[in-house]
């Protein structure tokens, strides 16, 4: 049976969580299971409390066997120019064909509902190990648009002082960004991401120009408070690259998940190969060390140069996530 799911059912979900096949925060293997479930329940509660929330639960023999939760994405919607939302949570208690069927039914119910609301683009991101969710999304018409590898650096296992970094270019300077730097960083974005291979570029139905504009607005949002610190790299007193970093998110802080995030970096194509990306990473790591035990950085599966650099300097791959998009006719 498929039924609507609301915040009032949070206690039922709390009891059901141990039966689900999903592993929250799978890229952080040091966390114990209770810490993971507390974090997951916190996230679920926030999603259900969102006024845009649409959620359904599958119940069999009086027990929850799966659920799906959707939230609008207002920032994405504004940039894309289409109402966009995300399948924030998609979980099932069985990883076999029965689980796929349960999830497919939940997705079908959800898509009918968001279609009536006027949602045009729906996105979903799932761990690469969640095969039931992947197959259910594919059967429901979702298109795979990218895969991100979750890289993690553990300060307790690899002291940053023991890492051998290459000698820096004598003309290179790393500093904190200020508001006057924004135009230069936007220019670097347009050069770096015009032919990128991320999910916005991979989606053939994404409106023209949207893919690059997403990254431009991302850096603009960083200056408006989304990022906790922005570093810029200068060569010969000219900005040639940047990196965006965030401290632990609120939900991570509440559940004692001691992480910092290296979310985005870009180097002017003319300045690549001179060690800017490595220098930005190192200086950001020194800052993050004061308040985080772990660093997390998502890297596109096809971005081999960055993968090689991270592994060279002590980062390791701890997980992978697939991104899916689907479009509904207006």
Q: What does each model-found stretch correspond to?
A:
Residues 41-117, 126-129, 155, 241-269:
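Conserved donor-binding loop and adjoining core beta-sheet/short helix segment
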Residues 92-180, 320-326:
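Acyl-donor-binding surface of acyltransferase catalytic domains
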Residues 101-120, 279-295, 300, 304-307, ...:
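Conserved acyl-CoA
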Residues 232, 239-298:
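Glycine/small-residue-rich hydrophobic helix-like segments
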């Amino acid at each position: 049976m498929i039924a609507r799911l609301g915040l009032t059912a949070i206690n039922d979900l709390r009891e059901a969580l141990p039966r689900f096949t999903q592993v929250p925060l799978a890229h952080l293997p040091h966390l114990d299971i209770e810490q993971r479930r507390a974090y997951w329940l916190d996230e679920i509660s926030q999603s259900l409390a969102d006024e845009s929330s649409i959620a359904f639960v599958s119940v069999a023999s009086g027990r929850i066997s799966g659920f799906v939760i959707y939230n609008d994405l207002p920032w994405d919607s504004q940039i894309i120019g289409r109402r966009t939302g995300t399948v924030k949570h998609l979980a099932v208690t069985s990883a076999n064909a029965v689980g796929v069927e349960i999830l497919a039914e939940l997705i079908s119910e959800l898509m009918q509902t968001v279609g009536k609301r006027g949602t045009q683009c729906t996105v979903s991101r799932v761990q690469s190990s969640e095969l039931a969710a992947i197959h259910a999304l594919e059967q429901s018409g979702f298109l795979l648009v990218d895969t991100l590898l979750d890289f993690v650096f553990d300060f307790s296992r690899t002291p940053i002082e023991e890492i051998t970094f290459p000698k820096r270019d004598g003309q290179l300077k790393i500093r904190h960004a200020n508001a006057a730097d924004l135009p230069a960083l936007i220019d670097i974005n347009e050069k770096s991401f015009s032919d990128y291979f991320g999910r916005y570029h991979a989606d053939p139905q994404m409106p023209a120009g949207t893919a690059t504009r997403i990254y431009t607005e991302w850096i603009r949002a960083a200056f408006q408070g989304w990022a906790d610190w922005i570093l810029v790299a200068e060569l010969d007193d000219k900005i040639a690259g940047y990196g965006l970093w965030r401290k632990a998110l609120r939900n991570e802080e509440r559940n004692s998940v001691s992480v910092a995030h290296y979310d985005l970096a870009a180097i002017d194509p003319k300045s690549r190969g001179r060690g800017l990306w490595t220098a930005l990473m190192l200086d950001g790591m020194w800052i993050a060390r004061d308040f985080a035990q772990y660093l997390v950085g998502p890297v596109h599966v096809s971005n081999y140069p960055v993968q090689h650099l991270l592994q060279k300097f002590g980062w390791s791959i701890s997980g992978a996530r697939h991104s899916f998009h689907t479009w509904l006719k207006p």
